[in-house]
Amino acid sequence: MDNSLSAYTQKYDKEGYGLQCPDGHVIRFYERILKYKLNKTSGKLLDFGCGNGVHSKYFKNITGGGIEPYGIDIVPSLKKVWEKDPCLEAKNFHIISPNSSFKKLFNTQMDFIFANQSLYYLTKQAFKEAIQEFYELCNEGAIIFATMISDKGYSLYERGELMDNGLREVKGCPSGRLDGSSYIRFTKDIEELKEDFKPFKPLFWGDYELINLYNFEGSVEHFIYIGQK
């Protein structure tokens, strides 16, 4: 995550980065799992790697305020974005240093942990510590939703050797669309996914592709983990 700070600061500050609408797999998570299967549509939600807050606002709005969002990110300029957004309570959103503890930022327990496309930038040790902090922050019965990049992801890019911290350098976008490097922790399979999120109990798991154009940039397959305390 520290390796990604400069890259994402550049994207947000200079390139207008940030979703304007919620991801399709997030909408399906709410409609199919939270609303239909679990009937769990109220409580406090921690959005880890919340960016401009688009998913936090989605959960708040779709539930008529039943879900109260809190957020964490590492890009300093996002603080001003949250403060200007009338749909967000800026006091509930925090900037943290990469790979740092966050458990003392909140004086409340969470009913949902939401980590969409953010946890795989953490080193192996920081990831392990984050999962434990999530668990300690959660009320009994809380739901965690998280996504991780599968080993198929970015296979057409240049992927460096596995480093001691569990990350690989990813660079050389085959289409030339992206510059620079990212440092990513890849997940081999569903069994590794389930193991990584212990002590949460797995409820549902699967995968999705953002887009897979075989002759352009290839697969960006992600795994989905939905678990419970």
Put a short name on every predicted segment:
Residues 1-43, 51-103, 145-229:
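Class I (Rossmann-like) S-adenosyl-L-methionine-dependent methyltransferase catalytic domain
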Residues 117-118:
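Short catalytic micro-motifs in class I SAM-dependent methyltransferases
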Residues 48:
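Conserved beta-strand/loop positions that form the S-adenosyl-L-methionine
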Residues 114:
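A conserved beta-strand element that flanks and buttresses the S-adenosyl-L-methionine
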Residues 128-140:
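A short glycine-rich, Lys/Arg-flanked "PGG" loop and its adjoining helix->strand segment in the class I
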